[in-house]
């Protein structure tokens, strides 16, 4: 599990730099309006930005985790002499794929989680063209949903989701739990894109 709770919000705020900044530049330079007129459909622009945000944030997350592992590898063993199965989520995936691919698989979950939260930064720059606002809103939404979902069933708990924990109470199967987490995050990112598209379509078509 990814127990770096004190740093998750900071990581999300930093990762929001990857795509929200380019949207801010589009708006401040007038490029967004040019793009809208050129492609004829605002959804193409939104899809490209949501897809780019997901790809950049996820790959940066996985790359960052693996880079950190490479950095500390000379200082400590990659795997302890006596790994404890009971504190390692998806232990069978770890046994099957090995430590590096296991970390990449867990990083994928946090990366998709982070891309969902950073997508709120894409929203805010259209209404408040400010770089700081884009980073702050991702940070605040993460903490807000973390607090709200603490009272919801395990399957909807943001803490479990961003920690790459197994979320399904009905089964301990790593396959179904991993599939559920990734599918839920893909759906959340898609919903974020759809809402952004509808908001912008209404705003710019109505002048």
Give, region by region, the residue ranges found by the protein language model.
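Junction motif at the cytosolic side of a transmembrane helix
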Residues: 127, 184-207
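Transmembrane helix boundary and interhelical loop/hinge segments in multi-pass membrane proteins
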Residues: 19-36
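Helix-loop interface residues and adjacent transmembrane-helix termini in multi-pass membrane transporters
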Residues: 39, 127-128
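Juxtamembrane non-transmembrane "cap" segments at the membrane-aqueous interface
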Residues: 74-87, 141-160
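Residue-level recognition of pore/gate-forming positions within transmembrane alpha-helices
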Residues: 53, 139-143, 189
